[in-house]
């Protein structure tokens, strides 16, 4: 995947596996290499930024890569039925969901007061699921004196991974058994490159 991203970021994308023969060969089934949970942002399509083709990636996209039951079910399906060996949780630079959650936190102090970072899957009390999850990541970052938007985006990826692992016994077991590796990443709109995150 990173080789494909290098091609994309250098303007040398090959657009593989997008021909008629590939499409017809996938009619009876799929065997993607990885599952990717990423933001719905129209500037961040995983298949394009990783220069992948039809059948290569099983993608789930939500605003701010937030997690709900449908997301967990989709990733569990990818593990159990499609046997993917890699899960990628990818945030990105200049994320609108992060900006929206930050604006909400700055406008309403009671949102901060509703949050405890003692639980890795704790959320803020808000009607907006984006504010509940992404806002919690922002406050977690701030509690560690990480105060830039870049920090918030990286911490949100880390908390999203923690949330997935804590809430899905299927994902837990697959990681423990060595069947799946889960990786955090962040796409840089300014360069077209994907950075792999370490936590």
Residue ranges of each PLM-predicted region?
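Divalent-metal-activated hydrolytic enzyme cores
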Residues: 2-29, 54-55, 64-84, 96-199
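Conserved functional hotspot residues or short segments at active or partner-binding sites
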Residues: 89
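Catalytic core of membrane glycerolipid acyltransferases/transacylases, capturing the structured
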Residues: 43-60
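Short glycine-enriched loops at secondary-structure junctions
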Residues: 38-44, 63-66, 92-95
